Amino acid sequence: MSTGASSMKENLPSKSRAQMSEPAFSNENVRELESLRDRYRKTTNALASAAHDLKTPLSILNGYIELLQSQKLGPLNDRQREVMADMFSSGQRLQHFIQDFLTYTVLETGELRMQFVENDMNVCLSEVCRIWSNRFQERGLALYFLANDKLTPFPFDAPKVQRVISNLLENASKYTPQGGTVWLHAEPHMWERRSVSKSASNGDRRRQSNNAPNAVKVSVSDTGPGIRPEFQLEIFDDFFRLPGNEATDGMGLGLAIARRLLMGMGGKIWVESELEAGSKFSFLIPLNPILNSPPRGTSQ
């Protein structure tokens, strides 16, 4: 009987024989893929653990630098103040680098959790500006923010919104030349995609689009060199660096992290830019958050 079975198999069309062997091949691929994923997870977790271990000593170091800068331990001459300022700036960059990496690893594992609590967007943004004001002054840049009294408190994750703004301000401060200006602005916004049903007629759509705002739009504008049109989507990809800017500080994660955080809040981000005319990064956050929005993914 075995001879007959063997003969039957040999007489099968080549396509049928390939189909019989396909499951074994697919299973092998699945095992290899799982092995690669497991190795990736272990490597990512190890790097995240190392980065996390650096946070505490770096925070202590930055704290002592701030204490010395305050001159509470004794006066500093001009040269010493200059050195301390450079040390503090370097420490802040390293701290931002570590935080970017830690946030990225959490986003990759899908473990990020949003905490929607009623907050005041004006207060949220003014706190970020206060934190960044010294950095902008050191770089010879002007940073402007004017509170908008049309904004009312609504539920959003303030620390993560501040993280998004910080990444956008960091990006603006890197590429805006000395003497340039950066504006931070927020306003109520009617996000039509979120409120107009697909089944509505054209007339209904027009009437619905006149409803009250259902989102907040936040924008960061700069007087930098601008971004070429072909890169205005790609800049939100993981580890992307604009050609010619590979030597700039950072891992190319700031905008990618901002995009993922906003996706987790049910929001979106985009850029409007012209060469030699600056860039304007804007994002939307819904007034009624979508609690089950996943923080992972590559499409909006």
Predicted regions and their residues:
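Helix-loop junction within the histidine kinase core
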Residues: 105-116
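Short conserved segment of the HATPase_c
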Residues: 213, 227-239
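Conserved catalytic submotifs in the C-terminal HATPase_c
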Residues: 81, 115-120, 137, 142-152, ...
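Short alpha-helical segment of the dimerization/phosphotransfer core of two-component systems
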Residues: 89-94
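Short helix-loop "hinge" at the ATP-lid/N-box region of the Bergerat-fold HATPase_c
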Residues: 172-173
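Primarily the dimerization/phosphotransfer
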Residues: 34-73
